[in-house]
Amino acid sequence: MDKRHDPSRRIIAPHGTQLSCKSWLTEAPMRMLMNNLHPDVAERPEDLVVYGGIGRAARDWDCYDKIIEVLQRLEDDETLLVQSGKPVGVFRTHADAPRVLIANSNLVPHWANWEHFNELDKLGLAMYGQMTAGSWIYIGTQGIVQGTYETFVSVAKQHFEGISKGKWILTGGLGGMGGAQTLAGTMAGFSVLACEVDETRIDFRLRTRYVDKKATSLDEALAMIEEANQAGKPVSVGLLANAADVFAELVKRGVTPDVVTDQTSAHDPLNGYLPQGWTMAEAAAMRKTDEAGVVKAAKASMAVQVQAMLDLQTAGAATLDYGNNIRQMAFEMGVENAFDFPGFVPAYIRPLFCEGIGPFRWVALSGDPEDIYKTDAKVKELIPDNPHLHNWLDMARERIAFQGLPARICWVGLKDRARLALAFNEMVKKGELSAPVVIGRDHLDSGSVASPNRETESMLDGSDAVSDWPLLNALLNTASGATWVSLHHGGGVGMGFSQHSGVVIVCDGTDAAAKRVGRVLWNDPATGVMRHADAGYEIAKNCAKEQGLDLPMQE
């Protein structure tokens, strides 16, 4: 019997102000763990899978139950340790220490590969935490929408003089991460054709308004895109098809999209990518009998897809890797020039990272959407001179359906995160919000990740693979008083290719919370500015000076 599978489970986080735990400092991680497994949030909640192939919230259902039990009895001077989704110890610390410390999927570098991890996973000794799955701060597809939107806006500026009208994006994948592309693309003014092999994912994106239309043939999908472009109104189409097949067919037909990318779960060739010509049922059966054969077939299909992306780039498409390591997989299968198209971070996002700007997010523990709308208004009040940000907040309210507990993503940087968080804490204190909020972020942030094929690709000083930085980030956030801190390996790009840390803090309206919030939400983005200044980026050096950071080697 698989202890990770229980179709009878239906997890819904409590709403309102009644506590199941001894304080909001422990109620918050409990609710956020449960929210990760909400049926509208998680991809396969019955298997504890939140997103990204096999990114889980807990190692198995026994571990999940025990985590909930411990959080409900945990005192405010105790800390729970979670090792790859398993609660392994409770220790006396102090009131300003984290209530939970999490380490997921970490392996000694020589053994940091999928083969070794999968053996440990089968034995029940490990859990793949992805980024926000195992760190209990996933907010559904909204969590990546703004970052994807910012990327597509930058693509329009760099390649099309800022004009996206009448242009379209080709991509693959409509899972927890990839599902953001269709909505973000249309928000940025592009039409989007997204290939997806799992029809239930397309239907889910239709229900939650991330996808406008569904197509079952390439001709039908292209006709929808053409009609929308002629009308001057962007449309998103979920095409039920294998991305490798579609990308190669477009090359064959001589049809060139304006932009090409991909967000299939290519980082995990065993569990995340369906080989060409295979059904999902066939792949599921083969995973039980011939893992090596599945991996080989998946990577061969990735090579076909990447070769098509290169061909489309040659034909004039703006082509980018969106951080799923598909170039690496194709390179390993003999596509020697797989890295000829850039990753999205060095091409479009790094200047933001240099100022500590990244995916700041918050969640209303009350479950009341009005709490999010009030905080949206507070952000506009405190940052009055940023029309781009205001436009994002307006579009988010109008077009993004909440999944589970109401939440908001908002890319802001060093100069704004702490003051926004302190304002939220004050709103809780004054009763303007009906319950506390939690503030966290993706591990994809400026100072919290080492990932040479994604966030730290092509660093100015060649320090792409140096992973001291996320370790320092996690240590500093722990020392600063975050409510829970996590340190993971392999998120986004797969085993052996990344290390990264996460942080979440509770704004419960107390003076003690204000002190913790002020430290954590200054120090956390400041490590990103520090990391980029150390690598030689002038934007980061200037930001550090302007914000008064004490960086000894920058004097």
Swiss-Prot record:
Keywords: Cytoplasm, Histidine metabolism, Lyase, NAD
Enzyme Commission numbers on file: 4.2.1.49
UniProt superkingdom: Bacteria
Active site feature: 410
Cofactor annotation comment: Binds 1 NAD(+) per subunit.
GO cellular-component term (any): cytoplasm
Pathway: Amino-acid degradation; L-histidine degradation into L-glutamate; N-formimidoyl-L-glutamate from L-histidine: step 2/3
Major location (coarse): cytoplasm
Keyword Lyase found: yes
Catalytic activity: 4-imidazolone-5-propanoate = trans-urocanate + H2O
InterPro entries, per the entry: Urocanase, Urocanase-like, Urocanase_C, Urocanase_central_sf, Urocanase_CS, Urocanase_N, Urocanase_Rossmann-like, Urocanase_sf
Residues noted as binding NAD(+) in the record, renumbered to the chain: 52-53, 130, 176-178, 196, 201, 242-243, 263-267, 273-274, 322, 492
Coiled-coil zones: none
Obligatory cofactor(s): NAD(+)
Subcellular location: Cytoplasm
Molecular function GO terms recorded: urocanate hydratase activity
GO process terms (BP): L-histidine catabolic process to glutamate and formamide; L-histidine catabolic process to glutamate and formate
Function noted in UniProt: Catalyzes the conversion of urocanate to 4-imidazolone-5-propionate.
Family: Belongs to the urocanase family.
Name recorded for this polypeptide: Urocanate hydratase
Upper classification of the organism: Bacteria, Pseudomonadati, Pseudomonadota, Gammaproteobacteria, Alteromonadales
Gene giving rise to this polypeptide: hutU
